[in-house]
C-alpha cells in the first residue's frame, strides 16, 4: 500500500483526511495519468454512493478532471460494479467511484478504474502518488475550448440493469426475495432489477438520507436481514454493502450464507455445466477451512491470494479463471464483470436455486464450516502487528496447541485502522478461547486508548 492508496483506492474521514482539496488534486493527477495518451477530450465517468460527503467530493474531483481537459459523464448514485461495467460499455477512458464501501458514513473514498473496467495497477497508483507529492503542479492547464465539460448520464443505471438480466437464463417468478440495500448505492437498483425479473420483493435499508448508509443494515449486519426474511417469510434474502460490490445471503430459515458458501454453490453449478474455467476457483486466506475441504470433495482446484478483491482479480486474470472472491461477499464472475458485484452475485445464486429446484438452505448445507471467530481491534499503528514480539509469541503458542487442527490469521486491515484477528478451530469453545487470548495481547500492545 502507498501513502495515499490502500487496497481499495484512497480512503479517509471526509473533509478532514479526504478533503475537497485532495479530491481536486486526485482529479487532476489521476485524470492526467489515465488519459494522457488518449488524445483530445478523453471521457471519464464519475459516480458516488449515498454518503452526505459524496456531492462535496464529487464537485471537487470533477473540477480537477475538467481542469486537465477531460469530458466528465456524471452517473449520479450507482454501485461500484455498475461504474466498472459502464466504463467499458461506454468506451470511456477511465472512471472514478466516490465511496468508502462498507465503512461508516464519516469515511469516504475515491477509486479509479482504467478503460478496461479494472482497478488500477500498483504502478499506476504509484505514478499518481508521485504527482501528488510533487512540490509544484506542472500539469497542463488548458483554457477555452481546451477545458473539459460535464454532462449527466443517469440512464447508465438502466443500461447496467439490462445487462445484468442477460447474464442468467431464468426469471424469478414464484420467488419471494428480501433485499437489504444498506441505505447505499443499490437502493434504487436492486428493487428495479428484481422487479424486472418478476420476483416478489420485500425491501429494507432502501431509504438513504446521506447519513444512514451501513448503519445497522447491509452485508456487515446480516442479522437484520435474517430477522426480516423470517418476518416476511421470504425464500431468500440478499444484503448488499454501501457501494454494492458485496453480497451476503440469508436462507429461508434465517441462516447466514456468506461469500464462501455462495462461491461454493456457484462453483459446483458452473462445473456441472462445464463452465468453470480450469476447474478452479480463486479465494483469499480468509476463506474457511471447510470451504477448501468442500472443494476437495468436489475435486475443484483452488488458488489462494492475500486479502483484497484486487488480488483475487489479479490471480483470476493471470490464470484465466472465471470465478473467485472473498468470504466477506466480494464475488467476481469474470465472464460478466471486472470487479466484485453484489447484484450480479445475487442473481447468479438465485439462478442456481431455480435451475436446481433446491432451497438455499439445501445448497448451503453441502459445505460444512469450521467454527470461526473474527475480532477487529482499533489500533494506533496497524502495520506493526506483524513484527510485535508478544503478538508473534501468543500466535505461535496457539498454533502449537492446535496441532494442525485449525489456523490463525492476524493482519492489518487494508482499508481501516484495524488489526483483524481470525481464528478457526475444531470447536466453538476452542475458537473463542484462542481468539480472545490473541486479541487480548493485541489490545494490550497496540490498541488505542479510548
Curated annotation (Swiss-Prot):
Enzyme class, UniProt record, top EC level: isomerase
Post-translational note: Activated by phosphorylation.
Record key words, sorted: Isomerase, Magnesium, Metal-binding, Phosphoprotein
An annotated GO cellular component: cytosol
EC number: 5.4.2.10
Cofactor: Mg(2+)
Active site, UniProt feature: 101
The keyword Electron transport belongs to this UniProt entry's keyword annotation: no
Cofactor: how bound: Binds 1 Mg(2+) ion per subunit.
List of residues that carry Phosphoserine: 101
Pfam families associated with the record: PGM_PMM_I, PGM_PMM_II, PGM_PMM_III, PGM_PMM_IV
UniProt-annotated binding residues for Mg(2+): 101, 241, 243, 245
GO biological process, one term: peptidoglycan biosynthetic process
The keyword Transferase appears for this protein: no
One example GO MF annotation: magnesium ion binding
Reactions performed catalytically: alpha-D-glucosamine 1-phosphate = D-glucosamine 6-phosphate
Function recorded in the entry: Catalyzes the conversion of glucosamine-6-phosphate to glucosamine-1-phosphate.
Protein family: Belongs to the phosphohexose mutase family.
Stored PANTHER family: PHOSPHOGLUCOMUTASE (ALPHA-D-GLUCOSE-1,6-BISPHOSPHATE-DEPENDENT), PHOSPHOHEXOSE MUTASE
Protein name, UniProt field: Phosphoglucosamine mutase
Organism, scientific name: Listeria innocua serovar 6a (strain ATCC BAA-680 / CLIP 11262)
Gene name, Swiss-Prot/TrEMBL: glmM
Amino acid at each position: 500500500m502507498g501513502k495515499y492508496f490502500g487496497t481499495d483506492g484512497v480512503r479517509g474521514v471526509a473533509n478532514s483526511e479526504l478533503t475537497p482539496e485532495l479530491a481536486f488534486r486526485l482529479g487532476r493527477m489521476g485524470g492526467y495519468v489515465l488519459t494522457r495518451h488518449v488524445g483530445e477530450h478523453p471521457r471519464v465517468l464519475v459516480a458516488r454512493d449515498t454518503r452526505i460527503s459524496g456531492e462535496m467530493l464529487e464537485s471537487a474531483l470533477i473540477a480537477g478532471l475538467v481542469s486537465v481537459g477531460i469530458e466528465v459523464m456524471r452517473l449520479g448514485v450507482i454501485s461500484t460494479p455498475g461504474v466498472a461495467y459502464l466504463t467499458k460499455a461506454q468506451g470511456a477512458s477511465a472512471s472514478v467511484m466516490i465511496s468508502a464501501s462498507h465503512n461508516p458514513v464519516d469515511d469516504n473514498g475515491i477509486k479509479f478504474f482504467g478503460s478496461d473496467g479494472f482497478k488500477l495497477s500498483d504502478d499506476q497508483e504509484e505514478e499518481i502518488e508521485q504527482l501528488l507529492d510533487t512540490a509544484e503542479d506542472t500539469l497542463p492547464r488548458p483554457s477555452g475550448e481546451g477545458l473539459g465539460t460535464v454532462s449527466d448520464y443517469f440512464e447508465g443505471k438502466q443500461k447496467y440493469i439490462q445487462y445484468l438480466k442477460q447474464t442468467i437464463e431464468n426469471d424469478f417468478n414464484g420467488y419471494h426475495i428480501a433485499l437489504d440495500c444498506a441505505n447505499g448505492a443499490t437502493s434504487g437498483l436492486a428493487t428495479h432489477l428484481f422487479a424486472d425479473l418478476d420476483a416478489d420483493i420485500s425491501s429494507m435499508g432502501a431509504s438513504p438520507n446521506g447519513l444512514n448508509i451501513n448503519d445497522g443494515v447491509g452485508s456487515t449486519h446480516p442479522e437484520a436481514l435474517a430477522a426480516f426474511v423470517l418476518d416476511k417469510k421470504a425464500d431468500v434474502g440478499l444484503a448488499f454493502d454501501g457501494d454494492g460490490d458485496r453480497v451476503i445471503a440469508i436462507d429461508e430459515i434465517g441462516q447466514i450464507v456468506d461469500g464462501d458458501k455462495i462461491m461454493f454453490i456457484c462453483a459446483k453449478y458452473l462445473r456441472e455445466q462445464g463452465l468453470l474455467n480450469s476447474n478452479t476457483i480463486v479465494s483469499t486466506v480468509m476463506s474457511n477451512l471447510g470451504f477448501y475441504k468442500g472443494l476437495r470433495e468436489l475435486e475443484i482446484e483452488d488458488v489462494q491470494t492475500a486479502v483484497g478483491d484486487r488480488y483475487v482479480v489479479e490471480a483470476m486474470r493471470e490464470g484465466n479463471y472465471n470465478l473467485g472472491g472473498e468470504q466477506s461477499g466480494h464475488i467476481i464472475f469474470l465472464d460478466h464483470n471486472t470487479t466484485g458485484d453484489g447484484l450480479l452475485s445475487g442473481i447468479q445464486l438465485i439462478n442456481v436455486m431455480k435451475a436446481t429446484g433446491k432451497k438455499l438452505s439445501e445448497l448451503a448445507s453441502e459445505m460444512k464450516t469450521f467454527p470461526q471467530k473474527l475480532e477487529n481491534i482499533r489500533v494506533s499503528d496497524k502495520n506493526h502487528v506483524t513484527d510485535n514480539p508478544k503478538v508473534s509469541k501468543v500466535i505461535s503458542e496457539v498454533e502449537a496447541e492446535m496441532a494442525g487442527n485449525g489456523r490463525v490469521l492476524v493482519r492489518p486491515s487494508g482499508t481501516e485502522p484495524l488489526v483483524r484477528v481470525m481464528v478457526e478451530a475444531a470447536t466453538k469453545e476452542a475458537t473463542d478461547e484462542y481468539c480472545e487470548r490473541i486479541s487480548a495481547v493485541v489490545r494490550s500492545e497496540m490498541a488505542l486508548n479510548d
